[in-house]
């Protein structure tokens, strides 16, 4: 890559990083292109050299950051660990994003997942759920997970729990420090995996037998 191309990419990244900070602080709809340019320390006109509009900036922020998460989650599925450990890794990846890049999480939760244009991105947003479903199905096939649960519903429940925790941190409803993130990982994963277990199925069947007896 030439020196000019490298400088251009660095400037583009500088603008995107600034946009994340501005969107996280002010919200997408109340932010102006000028706010992003000022945060990035570039001329207003230079921003339009890289992006045609504020909407394109947001779309790029989503596509690049979400893409990184999807790559990491897909890498987990491609491994040979037991399904329960794969689900644990997926939860850790998603929840620890809050510790590493909280502003990115704020933008993804507030400005992307709950925006009026969410239907335009639904295919990308549901990909983690599809991966989780695939992991659960493999766990059922191996006998690690109970066979009487719907993997599609179980995947939505698993991902939904993580999404609600992230939303709670974004909205300030819960503390999101290191200890709280670690506790959330244990709680979400251990509680749900206990419900997915074959032992839980056997216990449920025994209780139903007692009731019907």
Model-derived features with residue positions:
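Short, basic, alpha-helical segments at the C-terminal edge of helix-turn-helix-like DNA-binding modules
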Residues: 63-68
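Hydrophobic alpha-helical connector segments
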Residues: 60, 71-103, 151-158, 182-185
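N-terminal intrinsically disordered/low-complexity leader segments
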Residues: 1-10, 21, 171, 200-213
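All-alpha amphipathic helical-bundle segments outside canonical DNA-binding/catalytic cores
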Residues: 85-89, 120-126, 141-157, 179-183, ...
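Helix-turn-helix
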Residues: 10, 14, 22-56, 60
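Hydrophobic alpha-helical segments that form the core
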Residues: 95, 149-171, 180-195
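Short coil/turn segments at alpha/beta junctions that flank glycine-rich nucleotide-binding fingerprints
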Residues: 25-29, 80, 101, 142
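Short secondary-structure transition hinges
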Residues: 96-137, 144, 152-153, 171
């Amino acid at each position: 890559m030439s020196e000019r191309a490298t400088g251009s990419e660095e400037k583009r990244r500088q603008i995107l990083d600034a946009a994340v900070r501005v969107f996280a602080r002010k919200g997408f709809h109340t932010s102006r292109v000028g706010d992003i340019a000022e945060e990035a320390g570039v001329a207003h006109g230079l921003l339009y050299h890289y992006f045609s509009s504020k909407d394109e900036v947001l779309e790029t922020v989503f596509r690049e950051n979400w893409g990184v998460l999807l790559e990491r989650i897909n890498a987990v599925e491609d491994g040979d660990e037991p399904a329960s450990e794969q689900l644990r890794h997926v939860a850790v990846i998603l929840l620890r994003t809050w510790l590493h890049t909280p502003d990115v999480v704020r933008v993804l939760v507030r400005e992307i997942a709950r925006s009026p244009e969410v239907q335009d991105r639904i295919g990308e947003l549901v990909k983690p759920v599809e991966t989780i479903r695939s992991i659960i199905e493999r766990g059922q096939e191996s006998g690690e997970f109970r066979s009487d649960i719907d993997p599609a519903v179980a995947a939505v429940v698993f991902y939904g729990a993580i999404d609600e925790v992230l939303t709670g941190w974004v909205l300030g409803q819960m503390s999101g420090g290191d200890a709280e993130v670690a506790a959330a990982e244990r709680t979400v994963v251990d509680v749900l995996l206990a419900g997915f277990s074959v032992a839980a199925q056997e216990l449920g069947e025994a209780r139903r037998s007692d009731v019907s007896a």
